[in-house]
Amino acid sequence: MPRPALAFALAVGAIAVAGAAQARITEIRIDAVAPFAEGHSFGEVGSYLRITGVAKGELDPFSPQNKMIVDLDKAPRNARGMVEYEVDIFVLRPADPARGNGLLFYEVLNRGNKQIGQRLHDFVGSEAASQNDARTRAHAGNGFLFERGYTVVWSGWDPDVAKGNATMGAGLPVAMEDGRPLARRVREEIQVGKRRSADVEAVRLSYPAASTDRSRAQLTVRARASDPRVVVPPQEWEFADARSIRLLPRGTRFTPISIYELWYEATEPKVLGIGFAATRDLVSFLRYERADDRGTANPLAEAGGGVRHAVAFGGSQSGRYLRHFIELGMNKDAQARRVFEGMFAHTAGAGKVFANHSFGQPGRTFTQHEDHDYPENWFPFSTAYTLDKLSGKTGALFRGDGFDPLLIETNTSTEYWQKGASLLTTDPAGARDLSLPESSRVYLIAGTQHGGRAGLDSRPGACANPTNPMSPGPALRALVVALEQWVTKGIAPPPSRVPSISAGTAVEYADVRMPPVKGLALPHGGNLIGPPVDWINPPGARTEIRETQGEPFYG
């Protein structure tokens, strides 16, 4: 080889190595490989294998590819100056990959839980562990994805998911400052009787307390988000330990449904935004690499067939995760390759996830009663480019950089009342309809509710009215097929079908009238979507503004 050519080759090699070092999976550890569904044959695809293990990766904290990750510069580094992490992985793939359809179907975990069994496969098991530890023929439900030949992948992204029930998590580093874990004053909202049991004496905090000195903390309570906060006297509560508080005298229970808030000095925050990079880099590895640094084969490439396309699916928190993933530019990997060609976000409304923030709390979600003052709904909302007068910003969820996925978003009636779903197709002021890009579709699955799935009954649970038992499953399955054809064949799905201002089907909540029905509780109004207030240092001057002067809201 002539010297100029050799020099050029070496330079290109150096660039490739540098690019690979920015963000990548370094090790795949396979813990178990076993037949899935007791060896059942799914049509022409045949039987499936169940693969579990751990993926380890590393990130360059100074790479432009990772610059959007909050506090990554504060994470400990290895000898190469890289930030390390690891995530649980779970794969269901055709035993003979050549008989699969070449599509990787990545489901984003919801608080560490798998959900496609209930959302797509009509699995009616009541215990989360039943679908989280999918093994048997019953766990395959109707077999929809398997009969179509998908390779299904899950991986952890949240380091603080509840343990047990076979949940999947992530090992992420703690943010450090001056050689010690970062510490800040944070606001913790506490409510029992809905998302957590009311029969508890002590409640767990999202982060350990840097100090359990009550003189440096404050606990308040109110019945509703719109009520003024009432301070709980210091002698009426205490830190049970660094990670929990309880009321005094001992044995006193928190009032169910009431909103308690604790302002305290917290510490040991994980660098949560790494979870997004872990998804990006794992799927990129499974699509494009043959083996890890130790020579362990890519479990999707070792037997032939391989992955030609990748799509992602998520419902509720997981759907918001996908919207946030797009906004952060995570669909472009370190080698400038697209990660997912298609995405499907269900019941995400207009929100994202409180997960790329200092002292973030990914499990928070803005609903009718609680978690109103945490980051979830921030501009941009729509894939269409528009102006937000509240923030003074212009923009769109899509980045327009050539790496945006084909996107399908579906919502139910719940998300229009509680999650700002109209903001996907109207401007932030709610004044006009938007024209969405050709690569974006939005649908309302009318007559269904946020947690709709097969096997629901109408018992009210924590709600005032009976639960809507209607399942959106048939519509979701049809749209999965539509996304598949869009990605693989270029066949576009039907046009978006949503309420619109121009047609008079999208109206102010105050204009929606329903006659009184005996025994039926009617909503007092819409769940207004406003910009998030501060949750750290201090508790937020705008919190006081909201209580005394009102707050601007999105249309």
Locate predicted features.
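N-terminal signal peptide c-region/cleavage motif recognized by signal peptidases
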Residues: A18-A20
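Bacterial N-terminal signal peptides
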Residues: A7-A16
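C-terminal His-loop and adjacent cap/lid subdomain of alpha/beta-hydrolase
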Residues: R24-G555
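Positively charged n-region of N-terminal signal peptides that target proteins for export
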Residues: M1-A7
